[in-house]
């Protein structure tokens, strides 16, 4: 039976990001109807970690909005990491806090963070069409810094931004050069507050994207993330094919600003596909 790794997300700082990423409702350039707060209370984060671990999640990603890490964010994430690790839940802790230099990432590593998530999002060529406030090259350098710091690298992208198949290939080729241990695969879902006018990918095209990712990243943990619940809706037959085509990790529960599938029902569905849930991070 195929084993699936479950990962969960905690949006520990939400909204008011000064970047203009066209796909993101957390950008202050778009008037998204989202919750905005500076730092989530530590007790709430610990409750989330315990609850999701009890459901079977092994990965727990602490996400902050904004362009980059700064001293305040570093201290906050380090404090959360130490508190969660003291619980001895056996969680693999991931931080996702934007651009970061080597020293900052080494600080997080020493505080108990195991991996750093920083997505390339799309190809180098297409990126300027979806963001003007920072460059694709900055993203790539942060990924390199994570590896240099001795952290695991989690890096992937978004399909369905009106990019071409060549853009998809270029992104995956760049990801392959980084050898991430995990690659999140997101599917863009149209939102009226966002400037991207793109129709949701069909389930068949989404599956083709997964096959392509598997071809370029045969050894990475391919994690289906945002958009799965919309692209595949109630199409169990095609959703099950995700795992035949190379997906071996799933985001359990909610995303940053959108609802995911109800965790217990999602796990029941995954089990009905003949999958088993991983019990170890390795």
UniProtKB/Swiss-Prot annotation:
Textual note on the cofactor: Binds 1 [4Fe-4S] cluster. The cluster is coordinated with 3 cysteines and an exchangeable S-adenosyl-L-methionine. Binds 1 [2Fe-2S] cluster. The cluster is coordinated with 3 cysteines and 1 arginine.
Enzyme class label: transferase
Keyword match Iron: yes
Gene Ontology biological-process entries: biotin biosynthetic process
EC number: 2.8.1.6
Cofactors required: [4Fe-4S] cluster; [2Fe-2S] cluster
Pathway: Cofactor biosynthesis; biotin biosynthesis; biotin from 7,8-diaminononanoate: step 2/2
Gene3D superfamilies in the record: Aldolase class I
List of residues binding [4Fe-4S] cluster: 17, 21, 24
Keywords: 2Fe-2S, 4Fe-4S, Biotin biosynthesis, Iron, Iron-sulfur, Metal-binding, S-adenosyl-L-methionine, Transferase
Binding sites annotated in the UniProt record for [2Fe-2S] cluster: 61, 96, 154, 221
Pfam family, one: Radical_SAM
Residue ranges annotated for the Radical SAM core domain, each copy included: 1-228
GO molecular function terms listed in the Swiss-Prot or TrEMBL record: 2 iron, 2 sulfur cluster binding; 4 iron, 4 sulfur cluster binding; biotin synthase activity; iron ion binding
Reactions it catalyzes: (4R,5S)-dethiobiotin + (sulfur carrier)-SH + 2 reduced [2Fe-2S]-[ferredoxin] + 2 S-adenosyl-L-methionine = (sulfur carrier)-H + biotin + 2 5'-deoxyadenosine + 2 L-methionine + 2 oxidized [2Fe-2S]-[ferredoxin]
Disulfide cysteine pairs (residue numbers): none
Main function: Catalyzes the conversion of dethiobiotin (DTB) to biotin by the insertion of a sulfur atom into dethiobiotin via a radical-based mechanism.
Stated family: Belongs to the radical SAM superfamily. Biotin synthase family.
Subunit structure: Homodimer.
HAMAP family attached to this UniProt entry: BioB
Entry protein name: Biotin synthase
Organism: Helicobacter pylori (strain ATCC 700392 / 26695) (Campylobacter pylori)
Taxonomic placement: Bacteria, Pseudomonadati, Campylobacterota, Epsilonproteobacteria, Campylobacterales
Gene designation: bioB
């Amino acid at each position: 039976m195929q084993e699936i790794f479950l990962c969960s997300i905690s949006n520990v700082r939400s909204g008011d990001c000064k970047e203009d990423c066209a796909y993101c409702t957390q950008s202050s350039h778009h008037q998204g109807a989202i919750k905005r707060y500076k730092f989530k209370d530590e007790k709430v984060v610990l409750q989330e970690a315990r609850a999701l671990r009890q459901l079977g999640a092994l990965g727990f990603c602490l996400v902050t909005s904004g362009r980059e890490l700064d001293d305040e964010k570093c201290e906050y994430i380090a404090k959360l990491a130490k508190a969660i690790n003291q619980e001895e839940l056996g969680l693999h802790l991931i931080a996702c806090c934007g651009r970061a230099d080597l020293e900052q990432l080494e600080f997080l590593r020493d505080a108990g963070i195991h991996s750093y998530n920083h997505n390339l999002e799309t190809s180098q060529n297409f990126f300027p069409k979806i963001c003007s406030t920072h460059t694709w090259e900055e993203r790539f350098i942060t990924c390199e810094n994570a590896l240099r710091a001795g952290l695991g690298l989690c890096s992937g992208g978004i399909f369905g931004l009106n990019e071409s198949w060549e853009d998809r290939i270029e992104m995956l080729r760049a990801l392959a050069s980084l050898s991430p241990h995990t690659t999140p695969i997101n599917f863009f879902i149209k939102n009226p507050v966002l400037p991207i006018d793109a129709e949701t990918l069909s389930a068949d095209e989404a599956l083709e994207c997964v096959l392509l990712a598997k071809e370029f990243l045969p050894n990475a943990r391919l994690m289906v993330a945002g958009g799965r619940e919309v692209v595949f809706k109630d199409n169990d037959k095609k959703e099950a094919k995700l795992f035949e085509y190379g997906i071996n990790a799933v985001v359990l529960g909610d995303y940053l600003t959108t609802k995911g599938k109800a965790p217990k029902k999602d796990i029941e569905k995954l089990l009905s596909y003949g999958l088993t849930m991983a019990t170890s991070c390795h």
